[in-house]
Amino acid sequence: MKSIDIRGARTHNLKNINLILPRDKLIVITGLSGSGKSSLAFDTLYAEGQRRYVESLSAYARQFLSLMEKPDVDHIEGLSPAISIEQKSTSHNPRSTVGTITEIHDYLRLLFARVGEPRCPKHDLPLVAQTISQMVDRVMQEPEGKRLMLLAPVVRNRKGEHVKLLENLTASGYIRARINGEICDLSDPPVLELQKKHTIEVVVDRFKVRSDMMSRLAESFETALELSGSTAIIADMDDPGAPEMVFSASFACSECGYSLPELEPRLFSFNNPAGACPTCDGLGVEQYFDPAKVVQNPDVSLASGAIKGWDRRSLYYFSLLTAVASYYAFDIDTPFAQLPAKIQQIILYGSSDEIEFFYINDRDDKIQRKHTFEGVLNNMARRYKETESNAVRDELAKYINNRACLACQGSRLRQEARNVFIEQANLPEIAEKSIGEALTFFEQLELNGQRAQIAEKILKEIRERLQFLVNVGLNYLSLSRSAETLSGGEAQRIRLASQIGAGLVGVMYVLDEPSIGLHQRDNERLLNTLIHLRDLGNTVIVVEHDEDAIRAADHIVDIGPGAGVHGGQVIAQGSATEIMQIEASITGQYLAGKQKIEIPTERIPYDANKLLILSGASGNNLKHVELVIPVGLFTCITGVSGSGKSTLINDTLFPLAQNALNRAERTDVAPYQAIDGLAHFDKVIDIDQSPIGRTPRSNPATYTGLFTPIRELFAGTQEARARGYNVGRFSFNVRGGRCEACQGDGVIKVEMHFLPDVYVPCDHCKGKRYNRETLEVRYKGKTIHQVLEMTVEEAREFFDAIPAIARKLQTLIDVGLSYIRLGQSSTTLSGGEAQRVKLATELSKRDTGKTLYILDEPTTGLHFADIKQLLAVLHKLRDQGNTIVVIEHNLDVIKTADWIVDLGPEGGAGGGQIIAQGTPEDVAQQPGSHTARFLTQILAKG
């Protein structure tokens, strides 16, 4: 078949659509947020493609796979096995890294095991294993007639008299030994000092080099290796100062005997006990009690509470500190910061001195004991380890922090693995390089002879996989980067690169906005990757709003016309040119330039006396930058992926502002020197795209605070008062008014083992969540269930006469959420929808005009028309006097900003600098900025 034929798709809000999609093409599905794009791409096409493949497996195999729900569709023909690449975080496993996800680490392990050069950590000498034949051949290269002796080292730099050893050697028939560099007769050995280190090497054979002695020499080497374990030495009998030949039968250092077993791939795996650092078990980090968290207020004294739980109110612990203060003669009322460094060290880490302590027991008797002081940090660590109380453990956990493991320096690998090199680089050093740098390293790597042959195929796989990651714009990441720290867009592009590496043909790939988090500069490379995937012989279906992606598509499907109940129809399909000619297509109108987001006619000037200045920010790749944000304006933080935007705003500015304005106690602030200007704000709010709730019970009505006044209305009706129902009666979270059969969920979960779990409507309440008595109470003819089933638009009209409710509903309409239902489960909301629910909640609150709002890529999942609506909301917040800081790549947002801070010039180590700060027009003139190049083009369009 040359096409995918869909008939009667009704999944979620799809209106019984019929659609024919070409196979082996790049197809972009676009439309307003909530119009039904994901319902078509993921919940219909992908779900059915995956379901059909999984159903072909045995019932036994199916129980290990999560089978998707059968979509509500009459008929689909022409489907291939489907692979979905979504924007989910790749893994919450701390052992998962970019290298392990992409399997590059597996190839690196194989490479190091086969062609790596082990070295001694102490002497930096290569560890080389030799056969007896190689040893004999080497000796036979010496001049004919040269007098040599073969030694077997049996003791190396070890204390002791070694009397028994020397006696055993004599009994075994050995005549001579070299002891501490001197040849001695074993019949009369020297007396060795017990407390000194000695080296004893047995003379196994003495010979002149002759061509007919190879078999004798081989036997002598066998004896020497057996005697020493694995090492043999050839020394010149006539010239004691001549260089000696050291041979090893195992991977061992010729100087100290440091040895390795045969190199295997598992030695280089931090997920295998053979390779993992024994201190941190391969995690690369270790937990420790952080002095900065323990001493929360160094400007006050120990007596006044510099260390929480050890002040005057805690009789036992304070008595310990009092005794320590008495012994070391310092004042317990002196501020902790003013105590000598040595005293601070003793308080935190303890002392080996015997100190007299006085205790009061249960009978108020004073008891005296003399012992060492373990220190506050050691005390906490011991209690954390020994306690069986979860409450104590949770309290102590507040003082714990993570740091790079001191034993492996965060590399996760044991010492043996860290001391294997390829061209002077070990595995952790390669994993720490950015992907771009790693690719350059392997492209320039030249191995010789047999090593080159062995490594050829492995290197080809490594280079290809690294190139795929560069092609999807991830050259700034390192292979050692933990999967937990990746954004949704980064995780998706890593999976995309892995799929290209797999080289599958005849597959249907479904992607969700792969351009998220990607700068315009990297967009072209991403699109080339998608085209490459198509050219392999695959159907690539992309849910996307990016203009470049839409124009590059072979086939576009525009879903609309509106969102939610107003969407679910195919408005237009075809090429970009065809879409632009269809008046009903909002996407087509924007592509044709008939509709657009206008550039402000004039920029709002900033007040030089009202600035937020963050100095010396140096977290991750930031290079001591100074960030200037004008108060009361709309600021955009721009820059290529990995340039340091999130580190600067999310990891530095936001936690600092939280601590100062919201009374948070965050200690995970990235390094900085100073911050000035927070006095201009009364609170900071981060509006991100995380879910507004993780259970079916949470919904827009409960999150925005709408549900409380609605329940109060129902409780105030004549019927409710007559029955004695209060507000709690109309809650589905507590006993009373809810249906107890489903506990207010409205559905019952049925586990089906090798089929997906089925949620069936509750038999008792028929999915209405409330019991019959509660549903008998009506407000204006509607039950509480019917109100929750209303869309925001319907509810706005219904509650028009109730200002407290109408105002909150209007803010939801203002942010473009008129189509969602009040009781819609939060788990069904997209990231963009969840973010706009949060925005609406903030808009509905009484505004002081002194709020600092931080948003990270708010345009995720938003169509051109949605972005226009979002910008109207952000500009409204700005016009009320608030300060808006947005991390964004979308040029329509950037061009409407009052102020831009552009980071770069590149990602990773090549970034971390502020390239430009100023109005969009100022930044567009900056020659070293990638953002400027694209900004110039869009400003010229007007």
Swiss-Prot record:
Disulfide bonds: none
Residues at which ATP binds: 31-38, 639-646
Subcellular locations according to the entry: Cytoplasm
CDD domains (alphabetical): ABC_UvrA_I, ABC_UvrA_II
Cellular component aspect of the GO annotation: cytoplasm; excinuclease repair complex
Zinc finger (C4-type): 253-280, 739-765
Chain ranges of the ABC transporter domain: 310-586, 606-936
Record note on quaternary structure: Forms a heterotetramer with UvrB during the search for lesions.
Role of this protein: The UvrABC repair system catalyzes the recognition and processing of DNA lesions. UvrA is an ATPase and a DNA-binding protein. A damage recognition complex composed of 2 UvrA and 2 UvrB subunits scans DNA for abnormalities. When the presence of a lesion has been verified by UvrB, the UvrA molecules dissociate.
Protein name: UvrABC system protein A
Record organism: Haemophilus ducreyi (strain 35000HP / ATCC 700724)
Gene label: uvrA
